[in-house]
Each structure stands twice: as C-alpha cells, then as structure tokens.
Design a protein with these regions (language model features):
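Catalytic His-Asp segment of secreted/periplasmic serine-dependent ester chemistry enzymes
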Residues: 66, 72-78, 86, 110-111, ...
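Surface-exposed amphipathic alpha-helices with a cationic face
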Residues: 126-137
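Hydrophobic multi-pass inner-membrane translocation pores used for secretion
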Residues: 99, 103-104, 119, 161
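Structural recognition of the beta-strand scaffold that forms the well-ordered cores
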Residues: 18-23, 27, 55-61, 100-105, ...
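Charged helix-capping and loop-helix junction motifs
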Residues: 118-126
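C-terminal soluble interaction/assembly domains
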Residues: 112, 119, 134, 141-143, ...
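Surface-exposed cleft-lining segments at the edges of enzyme active sites
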Residues: 29-33, 75-78, 110-119
Length: 243
C-alpha cells in the first residue's frame, strides 16, 4: 500500500481567516502551469498576503468532481471525479480547522456527458450542502461562484448546447437565490459575451502551449479569476443575502 499526505494542520494566531476553495478541476487547476502555483486560489492567496492579511487558502478542488452525481459512487465502484460534493463535505470542509469562508465553484461536470443532473437537481444539492455547513459551522461565510462556460469545448465530455443551457440556469440561481452570502462572477470574467465561449486569450494550455479545450482556463484566465474576488466580501462580516 501507499501512504499519501492528506493535509497539514497548523497552529495559527487567533482570528486567522481560513478560506476553502471547493470545487472541480477549475479549482484544482487543470491547464495551469505545471508546478507554477498559478491557479485562482494561488492568486487569491498572494493577493491576501500583499494586502497584509495573514490568511490560509485551502484548495479542495478535484478534477471531474460533481455536486450531485454520480449516485452510484462507492469505494467498490469508484468514479474518476471522486465522491460528489455532498459525500466529501465532511472530509474536505467540515473537518478542517478554523474555516471562516468557503468559495464554491462547481456544477459543469454535473451537466456533462459524465453527469445526468438537471439544473434543479444541482440547485437542490447546493441547498443541502449549504444547510449542512451552516448547521456544523455557524457563522461561516459561503460564497457562490458562477460556473464558467464550456460551450464548444473540445473536451470529450463537454461543450454541448444542453450543458450550456443548464449552466446558465444554475448561474442565475447562484446570482439571485439568496442562498449564498456573496457571489463571485467567474462566468462574467472568463466568458466572451459575443460567442458564449471562453475568452480566446484564456484558452491555450499553459504548460504545453497546446490549443486548450475551451473548458479549463489557462494561467491568464486563472489570474483574472483570482483578481476578480472582492477581498472585503471574503473578510468582512457575514451577510444575509447574496450580493
């Protein structure tokens, strides 16, 4: 058997903000620079430090992960995207020390050819997860991030009009439902309103210089995403509705 480091729990001064980035490959950093630490959570961490905030940013993104599916996941029947958000919530969020804020970017894989969920099912999944977080970690601020476009992606599982329609419905929910204490509009940052696709400058893959897949942003895309996050929203007092 193999042993892997799962996490490092560190002593920190009282009041240190702990921000969890929860999501799929676009949080994990697919298409960023290999060993470059230029994913959007890395960008956020550096911005916080530069602004004088001693904060911890924890990346719990998993490539291929979904909010609701697949329902049949089990250790005996594993799935490349791992257990869904609800199933891994205890391990990857609730059990962490000192969490003050969570940024949740997820849903595109639920609508891919690897997922069968409707927009309404993902919305309900988000409601359930947010409810569990509030019950276990009262006072934690939960930020919803709009899902970036995958329209016309060359990725085998993504790119369809149906996927994009569901994504838009989910984003409308994230922006307007009031479920979240704040909203980060990554969709607006990464998407080209003229084409509905990812902005062309965010497409070429950062490590190999390849064509990219119109699903995963490159280093420039992650930089723009990380720079778009309102630090005051993350660190200020908890709001009762999205903004």
């Amino acid at each position: 058997s193999w042993y892997f480091l799962d996490a490092i729990d560190m002593m920190a001064p009282a009041g240190t903000p702990v921000i969890v980035a929860f999501g799929d490959s676009i949080t994990d950093g697919t298409a960023s620079t290999l060993n470059g630490d230029d994913r959007w959570p890395n960008v956020l961490s550096r911005r916080l430090a530069a602004a004088g905030h001693r904060a911890a940013v924890i990346n719990t993104g998993i490539g291929g992960n979904q909010v609701t599916g697949p329902a049949e996941y089990s250790p005996q029947k594993p799935f490349a995207g791992g257990p869904n958000a609800a199933m891994r919530l205890e391990r990857d969020v609730l059990s962490l020390s000192g969490v003050t804020t969570l940024i949740w970017l997820e849903g595109i894989n639920d609508f891919s050819r690897n997922g069968t969920a409707s927009a309404e099912q993902v919305q309900q999944g988000m409601k359930d997860v947010v409810g569990r977080i509030h019950a276990k970690l009262p006072g934690v601020k939960i930020i919803g991030a709009t899902v970036t476009t995958a329209l016309n992606s060359t990725n085998a599982a993504s790119g369809s009009l149906d996927q994009d329609a569901k994504r838009k419905a989910l984003n409308a929910f994230i922006r307007t439902s009031g479920l979240f204490d704040g909203v980060v509009d990554f969709d607006k940052v990464a998407g080209d309103p003229a084409t509905g696709e990812m902005k062309v400058e965010f497409v070429p893959e950062s490590t190999t210089g390849g064509a990219g897949d119109k699903l995963h942003p490159n280093r420039a895309g992650y930089l723009a995403m990380g720079n778009s996050i309102d630090l005051d929203m993350l660190l200020g007092k908890k709001k009762s509705a999205s903004r």
